[in-house]
């Protein structure tokens, strides 16, 4: 007997995987299903030209219930419905052989389990089969199973290796970017230490003083060019001071001669 928690989990998983809205499915009542588990757990109205993850849902059901789940497609005349069973019902309306393209006329059914899907897959690993409903003619539909993925095991392994190498390359690039960012954000002392230069405060201060002394001859002409009036006043004052000093020396020389 299916537990209530498992019942709810199957319904929620089905809606999530197939991306169903409230109007897209009908659920069998819990009490009715517990009395007769041969009823379908839910009936789903499938849309045209929409890719449903059928293989993933079948494998999920089997993993949760440990039973061979079976989905039955039926042409109701105006659309295709899918009834989801925990296991094969006692009476199956038809015994169709599952192919990649299956034509369903009115009231015809197609029973599908996980083994049927795996039988038509081009490779057993790395391929997920999806189901697409298409209109064939007036009242007939096509149930098409499309495999997405490499067509051979060697292609699948090569694809995995390429993905892993690409992932490692991107991770190495990110690591180098983080290292460069941390180096830029380091204080001056740590930056100098990381590149093997002077690390003491005295050596850093000496380096700053040497830099200032080297720049001083260059900064004087720049200061004079930007402050013409002030420089002219200073030159005039300097000339006046020199004239006064020269005059004092001349007077003292005259007195000594007398």
UniProtKB/Swiss-Prot annotation:
The chain crosses the membrane at residues 229-249. The keyword ATP-binding does not apply. Residues 1-228 are perinuclear space. Phosphorylated. GO terms for cellular component: host cell nuclear inner membrane; membrane. Residues 250-258 are nuclear. It is a single-pass membrane protein. Its main location: host cell. Keywords: Host membrane, Host nucleus, Late protein, Membrane, Phosphoprotein, Transmembrane, Transmembrane helix. Coiled coil: none annotated. It is found in: Host nucleus inner membrane. Pfam families: Herpes_U34. Plays an essential role in virion nuclear egress, the first step of virion release from infected cell. Within the host nucleus, NEC1 interacts with the newly formed capsid through the vertexes and directs it to the inner nuclear membrane by associating with NEC2. Induces the budding of the capsid at the inner nuclear membrane as well as its envelopment into the perinuclear space. Forms a heterohexameric complex with NEC1. Belongs to the herpesviridae NEC2 protein family. This is Nuclear egress protein 2. It comes from Human herpesvirus 7 (strain JI).
